[in-house]
């Protein structure tokens, strides 16, 4: 017969292969009413949370004669892909069509500062490949997803549940296992299994294209321009290095629609206390990046951590 995409069937408690409901067993079925198909499910301590393409349900054990019962939780938030939900520290985090949510007894939308970046450049036709993940050591939940120009996963977006901030990047990973069973997270791509959050090298060589970049922040007040005259870096190098360094790049723009202009690139080492620069505008972006020169032995095993870097900013007129 035809398959009902909204039907849940469960087996007998004594025989996992027996799905035919009989008066002598606990097998049975339940049909969901809201949506056109069941997309995915996540098990938590007290319930199984089931997602259709439009709704969220809670399925709980109630005992005989019904065995299980389902309750409709929300009708406006379906799951975008079968693996797009994951259990985190505060509930079940999931990706829907155009937004991110958390379920912890009720469904709540997560405020997201990068929503437009993700969903304006996103391959909806490959949404079934999205998979959510947790990096519990760093209080992170995230999603690997395909951009509009790719049929495969090539990007990620992460929500830090402790800091309540978002960040994103480019990375191809098709499966992820958080630390716990193993000491470090494990992820796969191109038939390789990679350990994450360990070491600072790329298979024995210095890593390239390592950076962290801020979003735009206002340095001018309304119609005022401002100038940045110096940077006091707060960068801790994670091992003894004599020749390793990072670059702090300062970019500015005068109007929101303008392109960013790089005004200064300052090399920062463990001995740098201040870098003098000249940058003027209304908005700025600061980027900290590793030096990509693999011939420099100081860049091998170079790890660093960014703290609260300070800028010397002064008002600089109206034009």
Say what each PLM segment does:
Residues 1-130:
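Beta-propeller and closely related beta-pinwheel folds
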Residues 36, 76-91, 97-319:
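Beta-sheet repeat architectures centered on beta-propellers
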């Amino acid at each position: 017969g035809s398959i009902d995409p909204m039907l849940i069937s469960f087996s007998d408690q004594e025989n996992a292969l027996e799905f035919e409901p009989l008066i002598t067993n606990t097998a049975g079925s339940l049909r969901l009413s809201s949506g056109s198909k069941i997309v995915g499910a996540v098990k938590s301590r007290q319930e199984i949370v089931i997602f259709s393409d439009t709704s969220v349900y809670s399925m709980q054990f109630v005992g005989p004669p019904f065995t299980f019962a389902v309750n409709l939780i929300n009708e406006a938030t379906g799951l975008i892909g079968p693996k797009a939900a994951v259990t985190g520290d505060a509930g079940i985090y999931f990706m829907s069509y155009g937004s991110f949510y958390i379920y912890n007894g009720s469904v709540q939308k997560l405020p997201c500062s990068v929503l437009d970046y993700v969903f304006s450049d996103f391959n909806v036709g490959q949404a079934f490949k999205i998979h959510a993940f947790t990096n519990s050591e760093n209080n992170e939940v995230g999603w690997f997803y395909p951009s509009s120009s790719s049929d495969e996963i090539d990007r990620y977006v992460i929500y830090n549940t402790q800091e309540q901030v978002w960040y994103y990047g480019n990375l191809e990973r098709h499966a992820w296992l958080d630390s716990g069973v193993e000491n470090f997270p494990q992820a796969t791509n191109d038939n390789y299994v990679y350990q994450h959050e360990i070491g600072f090298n790329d298979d024995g060589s210095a890593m390239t294209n390592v950076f962290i970049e801020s979003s735009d922040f206002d340095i001018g007040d309304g119609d005022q321009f401002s100038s940045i005259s110096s940077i006091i870096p707060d960068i801790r190098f994670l091992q003894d290095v004599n020749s390793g360094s990072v670059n702090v790049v300062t970019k500015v723009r005068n109007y929101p629609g303008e392109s960013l202009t790089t005004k200064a690139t300052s090399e920062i080492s463990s001995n740098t206390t201040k870098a003098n620069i000249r940058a003027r505008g209304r908005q700025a972006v600061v980027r900290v990046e590793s030096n990509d020169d693999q011939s420099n032995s100081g860049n091998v095993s170079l790890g660093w951590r960014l703290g609260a870097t300070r800028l010397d900013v002064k008002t600089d007129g109206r034009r």
